[in-house]
Amino acid sequence: MAPKTKEEKPASEAVEPKAEAKPKAEKAPKKKEKKAPAKKSAKEPAAGDAAEGDKKKKKAKVAKSETYKLYIYKVLKQVHPDTGISSKAMSIMNSFINDIFEKVATEASKLSRYNKKPTVTSREIQTAVRLVLPGELAKHAVSEGTKAVTKFTSA
């Protein structure tokens, strides 16, 4: 707000320049007025209706956040039942899975575009996994993925 008070003082002192250059002087306050209500409207919903603002924020967070924390924990307990994991390590694992998922999805999308097909099928996913993951890791991922798909289709 300090810059606004400084701007107001020169405007009140310089009445004569406004008379000389009315179009420029009139345009500048209009821009300032447009910016000020936008800031106030952004502040008012957060301060005025805290419950509604929180609900909107929660909905946005739920829609955007993809967490695999529960699944990471389940796999950890299957492999090492007596081992725990810190929250920082869990966050790192979650971001790692999100990165791999994004890479595989991007590669599968490219493959479907190369083949001029509108649908990404299990074949594109399998090829994308082979391209993204190295060596033995790709082989294990493909076998586990194939097993999961057959289990899903049979059920």
Swiss-Prot record:
UniProt keyword annotations, A-Z: Chromosome, DNA-binding, Isopeptide bond, Nucleosome core, Nucleus, Ubl conjugation
Superkingdom, natural source: Eukaryota
InterPro entries: Histone-fold (IPR009072), Histone_H2A/H2B/H3 (IPR007125), Histone_H2B (IPR000558), HISTONE_H2B_site (IPR055333)
Pfam short name (any one): Histone
SUPFAM superfamilies associated with the record: Histone-fold
Residue ranges with Basic and acidic residues bias: 1-28
Cross-referenced PROSITE patterns: HISTONE_H2B
Biased composition (Basic residues): 29-40
Region called Disordered, residue ranges: 1-62
Record-listed cross-link Glycyl lysine isopeptide (Lys-Gly) (interchain with G-Cter in ubiquitin), residues: 151
Subcellular location per the Swiss-Prot or TrEMBL entry: Nucleus; Chromosome
Subunit and partners: The nucleosome is a histone octamer containing two molecules each of H2A, H2B, H3 and H4 assembled in one H3-H4 heterotetramer and two H2A-H2B heterodimers. The octamer wraps approximately 147 bp of DNA.
Family note: Belongs to the histone H2B family.
Protein's recorded name: Histone H2B.4
Protein source organism: Volvox carteri
